[in-house]
Curated annotation (Swiss-Prot):
PROSITE patterns per the UniProt record, alphabetical: ATPASE_E1_E2
Purpose: The plasma membrane H(+) ATPase of plants and fungi generates a proton gradient that drives the active transport of nutrients by H(+)-symport. The resulting external acidification and/or internal alkinization may mediate growth responses. Involved in maintaining the membrane potential and delta-pH, together forming the plasma membrane protonmotive force (PMF) required for root and hypocotyl elongation and root tropism. Important for root growth and development during different nitrogen regimes.
Protein name listed in UniProt: ATPase 2, plasma membrane-type
PTM summary: Phosphorylated, probably by PHOT1 and PHOT2, at C-terminal Thr-947 in guard cells in response to blue light to induce stomatal opening. Phosphorylation at Thr-881 by PSY1R. This phosphorylation activates proton pumping. Decreased phosphorylation in response to flg22 elicitation.
Other facts: The catalytic mechanism involves at least four different enzyme conformational states named E1, E1P, E2P, and E2, with the E1P-E2P transition accompanying the transfer of ion across the membrane. E1P and E2P are phosphorylated intermediates.
Residues the record marks as active site: D329
Domain of life where this protein originates: Eukaryota
Gene transcribed to yield this protein: AHA2
Region called Interaction with 14-3-3 proteins, residue ranges: 946-948
CDD domains attached to this UniProt entry: P-type_ATPase_H (cd02076)
Location of Phosphothreonine modifications: T881, T947
MF-aspect GO terms: ATP binding; ATP hydrolysis activity; magnesium ion binding; P-type proton-exporting transporter activity
Enzyme class: translocase
Ranges annotated as spanning the membrane: 62-81, 94-114, 244-264, 274-291, 644-665, 671-693, 710-730, 752-772, 785-805, 814-834
Length: 948
């Protein structure tokens, strides 16, 4: 017999030898290992997970200096040391050291924050680590898959991702999806004794298995070593690249203009030109942008996890912010998934069988441990759960699977006779019992009555097994009865749906139940009853009445879909995406995985299977719809912070490049590159706090609108550049400030002008963040305390430098407190128009400005054709009155809504009001009575008037 070391070195072929030999080679039994044996073996085989590549901390740190934005700064450093050494002056060591310091500071912050975010993410993902049922010390328990070692006995069931390579023990064949490993699209049937591979998904069946390989020794582990993961460039990275390219191009344009004007035209000295180019390079590059955005997402991701939504993919946050359609499972998300049975409504179809016996048969066909919601409800209806197995001996249990849609128990009674009971979908049980047409019609009519009251149906059948073997087909099945299942809506679902509607998120119900049940649930939740059976839209037998309307339009307008199969979910998502919607999809089962993958945001609900979690982008740890809507709001707040910063970054690039370019070219004033470095360092320190800023989430779905970011940045940055140019002109060429405020003139002192321009640029540049972070007036929306404190500290430092600094190398001299006060006043006065520009850009980009100017002709007034019709009507009225005629009824005097966009907005508002009104009705006495009457099936006339 070989040792465990031989097993580790794979000198023994455990895949092919008989199963009994496997136990001998692994020195284990069908009773599993002890905890001590497991700990000893993990020292030999290592943990059951793939080895993570250890990354050098130094290389990771230096990696933050290796991106296009950093390259520009590094080019500036090379210019400062290599090119800036002409005209008898030494190399620009101060700027070189300053640039290196800026790069190191930025990389250090990035490194620390990403490290913290990585640790937080690792802690969160540990909660999502695959779990498995393992037999240790003779007891079954759920453990992390990482503790598995060869020799462990594990339980595999529907929806599980197989945790290690294993050989199947006795039981029914298993259907396994190996597409992730082998590319086979169809599930493979695995029989007892055969091997199943780590990473494949159980599609059908339940069985025990003995682990033969773990971690890097598995088939999956070996393949992972051979294949390097491909890095897909996400949408977020593309946006980051686009903004970075815009800033770099803006700087390049400014530099080309400076080179053309300064050298051939103005005949400036070589060194002066280099210094001016350095100003544009250092001041224009938003070096902190990758750090700020990644830190903002990491902190936001942590905040989402605290609300019960763990993000597996960081960029899912931006997609969540833009989500406008949410396809939500009914069971467990909109409802409690706590089923109850009204015994009075149970229907019996077998002579000599009581209603209590129907319930007992249903409980017998249920699991007594490791239950799903239906099993728990059936066993819970018994006075004592032990009754489900009292007086019988279990021979074989057939677990639920999506194909058969039923469970079954083969058992031996006290007399030694063999029987089988089954519960499941009525259609499947009717087919199983080969029911007559009359019986089928009767059953289906009762199912419809249940459905009208919002009740699901569960059928029960029984048979005798005279052959007394578990494989035998048995005697004909007998249809025993029908049970009504009530799954009450969550108490917060109706309110959450109303909130979602107000946030611009259309919630569509996805249910496998009948259409009538879906409509009744939709009515109770106030989400509308415009629902379709998915087979009528997407199946092979499509509804002829709907054939004239495009399927995409029907799906887009629907409030929900009933009778949904997993493949329909995928098609629903696909059709909605074709209509340019950002779609979220919830799911919990193995068959939901394709739809979760296809959706822009796949959401695995609480208690989802491993397969669903693996396919999703966000995993919920709390049940219900409210956690999703809270996550939407939080995602929008996170996205708002990122968008605010990108507008700010573009604005600063424009204001620095074109402000200093104009001053350098018009007045040949050479601003100090070192002072621009000081501005950049103080700005970066302040702007890091934006990741924790207080913001108002967008009231509608939001997304990266590069046109808006660039337009806003150019206008705000351009305005600030002009204000700096005007300030410089007033201080350098006029005595306006001296005459108005009584400060001494600095018009002929370039060093003091340097201090004045530095302070003005520093204040107004950093204050711009308060404009870009707010949707309304910037002084109305209170910023976060950290941002405010950072701004005040940075500007106090900037003011002290401007007042007292006397640095010859930076060509700056203190201007005194009088000038500092004047500059602060000038900055405050020029700050206020920034909000107006922001509103104007938003209005122009919305399309309404051009529409009102050219089509509706209502710009600057709400009257069509600029009030032409009203003026004509008034003139006509005056003329008729003048001639003694009766005034004619004025037609079309009042303004019309001539825009399709406005009409659609009005329709949307009306729809919203109708939904809220319907919701409010449910909370009135009338709505409550009608709901109870319908639920109980009472045959009474509900009064038409109520007095409350």
């Amino acid at each position: 017999m070989s040792s465990l070391e031989d097993i580790k070195n794979e000198t023994v072929d455990l895949e092919k030898i008989p199963i009994e030999e496997v136990f001998q080679q692994l020195k284990c039994s069908r009773e599993g290992l002890t905890t001590q044996e497991g700990e000893d073996r993990i020292q030999i085989f290592g943990p059951n997970k793939l080895e993570e590549k250890k990354e050098s901390k130094l290389l990771k740190f230096l990696g933050f200096m290796w991106n296009p934005l950093s390259w520009v700064m590094e080019m500036a450093a090379i210019m400062a040391i290599a090119l800036a050494n002409g005209d008898g002056r030494p190399p620009d060591w101060q700027d070189f050291v300053g640039i290196i310091c800026l790069l190191v500071i930025n990389s250090t912050i990035s490194f620390i924050e990403e490290n913290n975010a990585g640790n937080a993410a690792a802690a969160l993902m540990a909660g999502l680590a695959p779990k498995t049922k393992v037999l240790r010390d003779g007891k079954w328990s759920e453990q992390e898959a990482a503790i598995l070692v060869p020799g462990d006995i594990v339980s595999i069931k529907l929806g599980d991702i197989i945790p290690a390579d294993a050989r199947l023990l006795e039981g029914d064949p298993l259907k396994v999806d190996q597409s992730a490993l082998t590319g086979e699209s169809l599930p493979v049937t695995k029989h007892p004794g055969q091997e199943v591979f780590s990473g494949s998904t159980c599609k059908q069946g339940e069985i025990e298995a003995v682990v033969i390989a773990t971690g890097v020794h598995t088939f999956f582990g070996k393949a992972a070593h051979l294949v390097d993961s491909t890095n897909q460039v996400g949408h977020f990275q593309k946006v980051l690249t686009a903004i970075g390219n815009f800033c770099i191009c803006s700087i390049a344009i400014g530099m080309v203009i400076e080179i053309i004007v300064m050298y051939p035209i103005q005949r400036r000295k070589y060194r002066d030109g280099i210094d001016n180019l350095l100003v544009l390079l250092i001041g224009g590059i938003p070096i902190a942008m990758p750090t700020v955005l990644s830190v903002t997402m990491a902190i936001g991701s942590h905040r989402l996890s605290q609300q019960g939504a763990i993000t597996k993919r960081m960029t899912a946050i931006e997609e969540m912010a833009g989500m406008d359609v949410l396809c939500s499972d009914k069971t467990g998300t909109l409802t409690l998934n706590k089923l109850s049975v009204d015994k009075n409504l149970v229907e019996v179809f077998c002579k000599g069988v009581e209603k209590d016996q129907v319930l007992l048969f249903a409980a017998m066909a249920s699991r007594v441990e490791n239950q799903d919601a239906i099993d728990a409800a059936m066993v819970g209806m018994l006075a004592d759960p032990k009754e489900a197995r009292a007086g019988i001996r279990e021979v074989h249990f057939l677990p639920f699977n999506p194909v058969d849609k039923r469970t079954a128990l083969t058992y031996i009674d006290g007399s030694g006779n063999w029987h089988r009971v089954s519960k499941g979908a009525p259609e499947q049980i009717l087919e199983l019992a080969k029911a007559s047409n009359d019986l089928s019609k009767k059953v289906l009519s009762i199912i419809d009555k249940y459905a009208e009251r919002g009740l699901r149906s569960l059928a029960v059948a029984r048979q005798v097994v005279p052959e007394k073997t578990k494989e035998s087909p048995g005697a004909p099945w007998e249809f025993v009865g029908l049970l009504p299942l009530f799954d009450p809506p969550r108490h917060d679902s109706a309110e959450t749906i109303r909130r979602a509607l107000n946030l611009g998120v259309n919630v569509k119900m996805i249910t496998g139940d009948q259409l009538a049940i879906g409509k009744e649930t939709g009515r109770r939740l106030g989400m509308g009853t415009n629902m379709y059976p998915s087979s009528a839209l997407l199946g092979t037998h499509k509804d002829a009445n709907l054939a004239s309307i495009p399927v995409e339009e029907l799906i887009e307008k629907a409030d929900g879909f009933a009778g949904v199969f997993p493949e329909h979910k995928y098609e629903i998502v696909k059709k909605l995406q074709e209509r340019k919607h950002i779609v979220g999809m919830t799911g919990d089962g193995v068959n939901d995985a394709p739809a979760l993958k296809k959706a822009d945001i796949g959401i695995a609900v609480a208690d989802a299977t491993d397969a669903a979690r693996g396919a999703s982008d966000i995993v919920l740890t709390e049940p219900g719809l409210s956690v999703i809507i809270s996550a939407v709001l939080t995602s929008r707040a996170i996205f708002q912070r990122m968008k605010n910063y990108t507008i700010y970054a573009v604005s600063i690039t424009i204001r620095i490049v074109f402000g200093f370019m104009l001053i350098a070219l018009i007045w040949e004033f050479d601003f100090s590159a070192f002072m621009v470095l000081i501005i950049a360092i103080l700005n970066d320190g302040t702007i890091m706090t934006i990741s924790k800023d207080r913001v108002k989430p967008s009231p509608t779905p939001d997304s990266w609108k590069l046109k808006e970011i660039f337009a806003t940045g150019v206008v705000l940055g351009g305005y600030q550049a002009i204000m700096t140019v005007i300030f410089f002109w007033a201080a350098h060429k006029t005595d306006f400030f001296s005459d108005t405020f009584g400060v001494r003139s600095i018009r002929d002192n370039n060093h003091e002008l340097m201090g004045a321009v530095y302070l003005q640029v520093s204040i107004i540049s950093q204050a711009l963040i308060f404009v870009t972070r707010s949707r309304s007036w910037s002084f109305v929306e209170r910023p976060g305390a950290l941002l405010m404190i950072a701004f005040l500290i940075a500007q106090l430092i900037a003011t002290l430098i401007a007042v007292y600094a006397n640095w010859e190398f930076a060509k700056i001299r203190g201007i005194g407190w009088g000038w500092a006060g004047v500059i602060w006043l000038y900055s405050i006065v020029t700050y206020f128009p920034l909000d107006v520009f922001k509103f104007a850009i938003r209005y122009i980009l919305s399309g309404k400005a051009w529409l009102n100017l050219f089509e509706n002709k209502t710009a600057f007034t709400m009257k069509k054709d600029y009030g032409k019709e009203e003026r004509e009507a008034q003139w006509a009225l005056a003329q008729r009155t003048l001639h003694g005629l009766q005034p004619k009824e004025a037609v079309n005097i009042f303004p019309e809504k001539g825009s399709y966009r406005e009409l659609s907005e009005i329709a949307e508002q009306a729809k919203r009001r109708a939904e809220i009104a319907r919701l409010r009705e449910l909370h009135t006495l009338k709505g409550h009575v009608e709901s109870v009457v319908k639920l109980k099936g009472l045959d009474i006339e509900t009064p038409s008037h109520y007095t409350v």
